[in-house]
Amino acid sequence: GCQKFFWTCHPGQPPCCSGLACTWPTEICIDG
């Protein structure tokens, strides 16, 4: 199913916020 999660910041992986956690919720789909 799909669930919302918050991106963790890694160099070169936007979106990022202040080098910590991001405030952009993103929906991802995972199998099972």
From Swiss-Prot:
Amidated as well as non-amidated forms are found in the venom. Expressed by the venom gland. Its main location: secreted. Disulfide bonds join 2-17, 9-22, 16-29. GO terms for molecular function: ion channel inhibitor activity; toxin activity. GO terms for cellular component: extracellular region. Keywords: Amidation, Disulfide bond, Ion channel impairing toxin, Knottin, Secreted, Toxin. InterPro entries: Huwentoxin-1 (IPR011696). This is Jingzhaotoxin F4-32.60. It comes from Chilobrachys guangxiensis.
